[in-house]
From Swiss-Prot:
The encoding gene: rpoC
Family according to the record: Belongs to the RNA polymerase beta' chain family.
Catalyzed reaction equations: RNA(n) + a ribonucleoside 5'-triphosphate = RNA(n+1) + diphosphate
Gene Ontology annotations of biological process type: DNA-templated transcription
Assembly and oligomerization: The RNAP catalytic core consists of 2 alpha, 1 beta, 1 beta' and 1 omega subunit. When a sigma factor is associated with the core the holoenzyme is formed, which can initiate transcription.
Protein name from the UniProt record: DNA-directed RNA polymerase subunit beta'
Cofactor: how bound: Binds 1 Mg(2+) ion per subunit. Binds 2 Zn(2+) ions per subunit.
SUPFAM superfamilies: beta and beta-prime subunits of DNA dependent RNA-polymerase (SSF64484)
Cofactor(s) annotated in UniProt: Mg(2+); Zn(2+)
Molecular function GO labels: DNA binding; DNA-directed RNA polymerase activity; magnesium ion binding; zinc ion binding
Binding site for Mg(2+): D482, D484, D486
UniProt function note: DNA-dependent RNA polymerase catalyzes the transcription of DNA into RNA using the four ribonucleoside triphosphates as substrates.
Class in the EC hierarchy, top level: transferase
Amino acid sequence: MSKFKVIEIKEDARPRDFEAFQLRLASPEKIKSWSYGEVKKPETINYRTLKPERDGLFCAKIFGPIRDYECLCGKYKKMRFKGVKCEKCGVEVANSKVRRSRMGHIELVTPVAHIWYVNSLPSRIGTLLGVKMKDLERVLYYEAYIVENPGDAFYDNESTKKVEYCDVLNEEQYQNLMQRYENSGFKARMGGEVVRDLLANLDLVALLNQLKEEMAATNSEAKKKTIIKRLKVVENFLNSNLNANTDSDEAVPNRPEWMMITNLPVLPPDLRPLVALDGGKFAVSDVNDLYRRVINRNTRLKKLMELDAPEIIIRNEKRMLQEAVDALFDNGRRANAVKGANKRPLKSLSEIIKGKQGRFRQNLLGKRVDFSGRSVIVVGPKLRMDQCGLPKKMALELFKPHLLAKLEEKGYATTVKQAKKMIENKTNEVWECLEEVVKGHPVMLNRAPTLHKLSIQAFHPVLVEGKAIQLHPLVCAAFNADFDGDQMAVHVPLSQEAIAECKVLMLSSMNILLPASGKSVTVPSQDMVLGIYYLSLEKAGAKGSHKICTGIDEVMMALESKCLDIHASIQTMVDGRKITTTAGRLIIKSILPDFVPENSWNKVLKKKDIAALVDYVYKQGGLEITASFLDRLKNLGFEYATKAGISISIADIIVPNDKQKAIDEAKKQVREIQNSYNLGLITSGERYNKIIDIWKSTNNVLSKEMMKLVEKDKEGFNSIYMMADSGARGSAAQISQLAAMRGLMTKPDGSIIETPIISNFREGLNVLEYFISTHGARKGLADTALKTANAGYLTRKLIDVAQNVKITIEDCGTHEGVEINEITADSSIIETLEERILGRVLAEDVIDPITNSVLFAEGTLMDEEKAKILGESGIKSVNIRTPITCKAKKGICAKCYGINLGEGKLVKPGEAVGIVSAQSIGEPGTQLTLRTFHSGGTASTDLQDRQVSAQKEGFIRFYNLKTYKNKEGKNIVANRRNAAILLVEPKIKTPFKGVINIENIHEDVIVSIKDKKQEVKYILRKYDLAKPNELAGVSGSIDGKLYLPYQSGMQVEENESIVEVIKEGWNVLNRIPFASEILVEDGEPVVQNIKAGEKGTLKFYILKGDGLDRVKNVKKGDIVKEKGFFVVIADENDREAKRHYIPRESKIEFNDSEKIDDANTIIASAPKKERKVIAEWDAYNNTIIAEIDGVVSFEDIEAGYSADEQIDEATGKRSLVINEYLPSGVRPTLVIAGKGDKAVRYQLEPKTVIFVHDGDKIAQADILAKTPKAAAKSKDITGGLPRVSELFEARKPKNAAVIAEIDGVVRFDKPLRSKERIIIQAEDGTSAEYLIDKSKHIQVRDGEFIHAGEKLTDGVVSSHDVLKILGEKALHYYLISEIQQVYRGQGVVISDKHIEVIVSQMLRQVKVVDSGHTKFIEGDLVSRRKFREENERIIRMGGEPAIAEPVLLGVTRAAIGSDSVISAASFQETTKVLTEASIAGKFDYLEDLKENVILGRMIPVGTGLYGEQNLKLKEQE
């Protein structure tokens, strides 16, 4: 860093050009130099004259005059005496503002400790002296002595225990030692003075060296910790002047004795005001009371000392002085808070700056501004996109100064006074001038809560009558505004720069896209959607159907003359082609720009289609075209919604006729289940789950039935159906509550009540049903209130951690990236690869899997078209650049960030991407929370998965899969992990019989086949192959990766497939549970109907080696018999448009070289209609099966002790159920003793039902027991927000799973201290040991192979573990997919890059493992930037650099650990941050946003980046 000069700030100066801000401890001399005089008296003002008392807390002589340029006695008045000191009253004539900056001081008779350095952990004074905080307090509060000079003193008579320097003694010990060793130089004292002397005598450099030696000498971790604590404080003191200029007097480092106060500074009086209220009372700032007590006690102490009072009285007075100063600095930190007259604690200096009402957050980060007003909003449908209606009354006030100037300029008024009078009388000239002033002067509108940047937008005002602001209907979505009484604030930009920014950057017509997702935010909603939907509908047999019209004018004439219905199907010419459309759609076409293709408008337009249309117009046409198009769309929508005259009537709500039948059927099923529960055939959990499933499916059937009826009603013109179908208002779920049945409800705790509400709202609810309904409704409202606060807090934390992230350079030049693929949860796709790659820059070439040529080169920016090509090419994973891998020194580079979603272009340097990201994640947080009650508390849980089935075609490969055959001859999965069933298609087939060989060379894998005569080699890229841990489902995804079914040295037949492409995979544990039944064989083909997907000519091929050979004799009706059969669809230029693999047993539906047109044509068909089921299992229970034949014995399973007996009444069978709560140390276990000494143990979880008896003989794969899965809870969004904040806070979960750190084989060792010991042994001989609590359920078996990152026990994976074991890229994948699951599950689209920006901030600190020669200490958390700079400095000097490991900090910790002092202090834990910074003399280089806002400077992003540089604007030709 460069050296800085310290600026002396003059009294009235407002320096703009300072570059840094440093916090330091103030020396007593410094405090004196600030002071303008000593405050000697506790008086404030004279109650009669109301003038400040001399030498008092408000003294004018010390602090300056009360009135501008006027001394207290009135001898000197006016400017011309500036700087004169009055002889009579001693007041200097000056501006009264100096009372805000001039300080005084109080000379304390005895040094007093500053409470921040005593009481905030770790206690700085205590640490330096090596004294415990409690002991230090006893010394300071005169309860104990501290040894200043031990002399030759010993504690015991035998002289073995020596008295050490800084030992703390009680009264008795002190008297004892004094008697015996007074002459040997023993000396101990108590109180502030001795502590100050001890601190003054410290030689920090010597102490530092001594501590370093001790550190090197010790082996105990605990000792190391305490030494490191002391080292940190000592180093902070020594380094506290590193950046000061050596020639200035500021270069002295902080001294420890400055933590003791001898001169107490007094705050300028105007910062602790005393205001006269009417009625002769005064409102006083609490600080004055606290100062008064200090002064009183100080003067009393002075008097007592002059009188030579007894020691005990003086001590008491000194203690009281210490307490008074403590209270002034931080009241209530120690002991009880000092209370004022009204029995509430006084607000001390610390309280004034911290918290929401403190100086930082209340007055510095957010200020009230002038030229603003607020009013209620109403809709302004006639406005243009960039206009708002401003009430004349408001405009008159807001633009008053402009208006006064205008009136004078026009000559209507000669003086300001006259102009003011005109405005008061509201003459005609005033209105005329107001129109002119307002023209071309934009205003900003803001709706609280301001959750993202679109909550403040600029508009051109249009003056309107009335008192309400008019708002354009399309910008409501961005503001989240509606017209039920919302209010908005208006702000007037004043400077020319501000006005220019409003016009160029903030106009609402410029902000069409959401920065969170890049989707358009100005999409028509509600009435507008309804109107456009109505207009685009088609009605069979409407008036004038099948007519031919030349164009829109003819259609309009026909409509006017009533010979054509708006919904009639007509034919017309568009772009030289004859098309069939409707009259209404032609009207829509007439407002569209010419470049919109027919398939975008010639269909029924629902809300999603309209949104897609707006997006398309924006992408193709740009801002101006889109803005005017949106206005036309809005007008059209409103017009036809009005003309349609859609209304709601009770006749629109149609109840299905067979509702009662369905309900009776469901009730019958429920009775059956209840009976089988009573007979003991199923557990209570199963009963509950099954009943809920029955009612769910009944509800679904009824809803579907009802929707069909409503849809058919009035030929699709049923009002309610139109509203829901168009997306204008309501949903199918809500209609089904109106017309089918209300369904299952939830209790306030989120569990589902098993009796549903059978009535619907049309029939009406009975009393019980109504009562159950209220639960859900009430819960929704309560949740909303609670969660809004949480979401707001999350946003604040995110903003704080990300505020300093901005785009600094174009390209950081890194080649590193992160591999991404689609995010899936279970079997549903959460986010496709196409969505994830949009707007990102590639970090590696993308290779086309079919042609093996480079599809896109490294460094390509993926726009919509490229992303689409990529999506269609069948590529499953891509390497992209991300903020996490960016190597820019500060901030992020544009290439690693990608497209700025708000503009759709590559981001420019200076963009505040951190803030945008935080807003994008936080804003839907509040949305999520506010959305709970819309479904009225009706329950929603997905039907539980009972099976997996193949969605694609290919053939089956078992990876590591072992199965058992049970008595029924079924195949049962025997693996618990590290196995999978893959669906593959062949990529390379063997040209001849031979031996396979596989070798790894650098980035390539070479597969070769060899027989006696010949050898062929195939080269594959290493990262295209699926890794073992990916196949096992530990990390990453395997779709599209390559799989090698054979190992080196195996013999392979001719035409066998040796390299395969994985199309789908189901790994054991995550997708296929243990003990599932497998319904496919290894190598079995899976046949689906294959659709063409493109139009063109069919060509059939067969795979030979790694190339395709043409097969021409294929006819319709052939059955494929051979592996490796492909069909290619060639387009008109004979290029390959699409390629499909056709598995064996498929039936070909076309001849070779035949032309096909439609994309949905089936080329090859499957013999069976339904999808191929891969595996099935019990949906309600986890099954435990026997792994060997043998005899069962029970351990710790005893009826009435650890288990309960249940008797089945019908059959008389007894079964044991493990109790839910077990005594400690009791672990119910089933043991199977097999042949020889083979034994297998099964530890049982609570609630497990046991199906065997002690001593039973059993066979392999028999069912031993079942554990019910947890009862289904309704998915409320609560999972959402707390989950997101848990991830961002990187909290260690309560029930964290123990994770394997290395790949290897599991071994169980002897239990240690009632904990299980698991050892993992790797192939290379390393091993890792884990001790696991007995309460945890272990999920691995002895002898199993496990991958790093897999869970050993049940529980939640902690993100810290992911980072530690699998590294930063795996953490990136984990956090993003977890967070996206929450948001996508709620239908909220957020681009990954926003989450990545936050994650990169959570990883911005590293933990020093080895300090080398640097100034760091091991265990330090330092920012990567500081770490890098320090290492570079040490390397330049030829020293050892430090080594560090990455750490993941939660957003709160990361924000407090900010490099900027001001920013950290204004976030949380203000006192702690300031204490630390002052000792270390920390610098704040004012690089980020927050600290500049606080100091009132331009923020260094966007246009503020160019700050003081003079910009020249030139007009475009």
